[in-house]
């Protein structure tokens, strides 16, 4: 998959002139120690060194493997304050607001007031990552990236992760990759009372492959571009399926019609986003369709058949 290639360093070409990730991580460590000394962030529990057995694959030159906690300056559960549909002005993001693909969904919100004890500490900041620690088996461990400018908070089934010195978009992509899912999440899921749970204290120990900072940004741009292309193709395929279904219905209607009525000759051009009138579908069924349009339909039909086989 795209994300798997991204975290293995196979999506973008490496530039030997880029500052190595090792230097970047050393600088982040020094900056965090300064922030701790200034009492701007809390001191974290020591993290274990990474053993050879834990390393999932060979990294490209200039990359480093680190624990997520090495690049965090905040790692905390959300509010347990009861939220409702009517009272309050601050939206509360909950586990259902993170989609299976890691996108954030801002519908079906509940609210709390500004006077609860968890605020302002638990206001979300743009760039915060939300980790789903309790949900169904398929959704537990999914992460969303908060990129709103408005005031939101989050519920206790989510964990807020605030990244420091690394592209939060890159980390978000990494945490939704197949690598992260199969090696860092699934082995530690616990099924309990009909729900899947992930120990929140484990998150900081998970492993993140870190490229040089410039390459992180290249990877994010490449993945976002490919995702947009994928979504556009998916929409075109759905439109083609809809057209094929309409065409098949007209073919069957034509084949089993008791009384055939002559139709004037027509030339049909293919437009994926249009709703095809019945008369045009019947004309297409009789073969009155431009050759290049027919070739396009045949090619798309073969692609659809290949995807569904």
Language-model-detected regions and their locations in the chain:
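Non-catalytic DNA-recognition/assembly elements of restriction-modification systems
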Residues: 1, 10, 51-77, 213, ...
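Short, ligand-facing micro-motifs at secondary-structure edges
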Residues: 79, 99-110, 129-154, 169-173, ...
């Amino acid at each position: 998959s795209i994300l798997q290639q991204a975290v293995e360093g196979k999506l973008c070409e490496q530039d030997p002139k880029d500052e190595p990730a090792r230097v970047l991580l050393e600088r982040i460590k020094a900056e965090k120690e300064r922030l701790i000394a200034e009492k701007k962030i809390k001191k974290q529990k020591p993290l274990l060194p990474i053993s050879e057995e834990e390393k999932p694959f060979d990294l490209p030159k200039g990359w480093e493997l680190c624990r997520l906690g090495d690049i965090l300056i905040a790692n905390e559960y959300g509010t347990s304050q009861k939220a409702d549909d009517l009272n309050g002005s601050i939206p509360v993001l909950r586990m259902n607001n993170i989609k299976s693909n890691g996108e954030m969904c801002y519908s079906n919100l509940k609210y709390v007031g500004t006077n609860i004890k968890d605020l302002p500490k638990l206001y979300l900041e743009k760039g915060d990552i939300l980790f789903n620690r309790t949900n169904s088996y398929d959704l537990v461990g999914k992460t969303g990236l908060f990129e709103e400018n408005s005031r939101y908070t989050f519920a206790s089934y989510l964990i807020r992760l605030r990244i420091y010195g690394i592209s939060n978009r890159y980390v978000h992509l990494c945490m939704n990759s197949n690598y992260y899912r199969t090696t860092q999440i699934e082995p530690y899921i616990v099924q309990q009372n009909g729900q899947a749970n992930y120990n929140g204290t484990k998150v900081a120990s998970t492993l993140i492959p870190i490229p040089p900072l410039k390459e992180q940004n290249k990877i994010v741009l490449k993945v976002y571009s490919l995702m947009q292309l994928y979504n556009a193709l998916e929409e075109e395929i759905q439109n083609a399926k809809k057209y094929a279904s309409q065409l098949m219905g007209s073919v069957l209607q034509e084949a089993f019609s008791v009384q055939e009525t002559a139709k004037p000759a027509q030339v049909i051009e293919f437009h994926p986003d249009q709703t095809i009138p019945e008369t045009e579908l019947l004309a297409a069924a009789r073969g009155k369709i431009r050759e290049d349009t027919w070739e396009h339909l045949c090619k798309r039909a073969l692609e659809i058949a290949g995807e569904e086989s």
